[in-house]
Amino acid sequence: MMSYLKQPPYAVNGLSLTASGMDLLHQSVGYPATPRKQRRERTTFTRAQLDILEALFAKTRYPDIFMREEVALKINLPESRVQVWFKNRRAKCRQQQQQQQNGGQNKVRPSKKKTSPVREVSSESGTSGQFSPPSSTSVPVISSSTAPVSIWSPASVSPLSDPLSTSSSCMQRSYPMTYTQASGYSQGYAGSTSYFGGMDCGSYLSPMHHQLSGPGATLSPMGTNAVTSHLNQSPVALSSQAYGASSLGFNSTDCLDYKDQTASWKLNFNADCLDYKDQTSSWKFQVL
């Protein structure tokens, strides 16, 4: 035990730590305070000094040592102060230029954002303008139900009853052939399925044996202008329905006997039933 205590001090990297050296690590031992670097006082420039420095900065942003010393003698300041002033002045100038560029970009960007809603509004107005003609054409169709004269009902047959005159749309038919009749009316039908749209019923229901009120007129199934002109004279308008398995909305006791043939069209009004005869298939509709 005694031999262990008498061993030489432990060596670290060739340096022996003695007991006296260990005392330096004790808390009670005071260490010499490091000298604190004193802060340099801020230099204040007068108006005359700033005028001289600004005049030199206007000539050159990077003056050499001789120019700085000459100006330092004029303003009674050390050359190091003049050098620092030019350094700060260049940094300030770069900052102002960057702010101007950013400000210009920020002004341009909102203008781009403002133009995009204008384009959207114009596109919306364009789309609404495209859909406005159908709405304008539908207005005279609604107002045409009060006209007193029938254009397709023959004189020998009474027109349909009042419930049919309450609706504002007429029947529109399409057939795959074009029929030209002896009475001088040209009717073109396209498509295989028949349906009821907003077109003139007189253009499709007027038979070849009955003449319309307007002599020599050519009835087009897709002409909306002719539709409105004929509807202004007709009190009868049929509701928009699919012409197929569904029944027709006839509230009158009159019946429509419609025969579809390749060479002739016949329209008859009977008393109790609606009989629709076709070559390919037979459909019978009766009002209950």
Swiss-Prot record:
The keyword Nuclease does not apply. The record marks 87 as: Determines DNA-binding specificity. Residues 93-140 are annotated as: Disordered. Pfam families: Homeodomain (PF00046), TF_Otx (PF03529). InterPro entries: HD, Homeobox_CS, Homeodomain-like_sf, Otx2_TF, Otx_TF, Otx_TF_C. Keywords: Developmental protein, DNA-binding, Homeobox, Nucleus. One of its GO terms (biological process) is notochord morphogenesis. Shows a localized expression in the dorsal region of the marginal zone at stage 9.5. At stage 10.5, expressed in dorsal bottle cells of the dorsal deep zone fated to give rise to prechordal mesendoderm. Also begins to be expressed in presumptive anterior neuroectoderm where expression persists in subsequent stages. At stage 14, expression is confined to mesendoderm and ectoderm cells of anterior dorsal regions. Its main location: nucleus. One of its GO terms (molecular function) is DNA-binding transcription factor activity, RNA polymerase II-specific. Changing residue 87 to Q: Produces a proportion of abnormal phenotypes when injected, but these are substantially different from those for intact otx2-A injections. Residues 95-106 have a biased composition (Low complexity). One of its GO terms (cellular component) is nucleus. May play a central role in the initial events of axis formation and in particular in specifying anterior head regions and their spatial relationship with trunk structures. Activates the head organizer gene cer1 by acting synergistically with siamois and mix-A/mix.1 through the 5'-TAATCT-3' element of the cer1 promoter. Also binds as a complex with lhx1/lim1 and ldb1 to the gsc promoter to stimulate expression. Belongs to the paired homeobox family. Bicoid subfamily. This is Homeobox protein OTX2-A. It comes from Xenopus laevis (African clawed frog). The lineage of its organism: Eukaryota, Metazoa, Chordata, Craniata, Vertebrata.
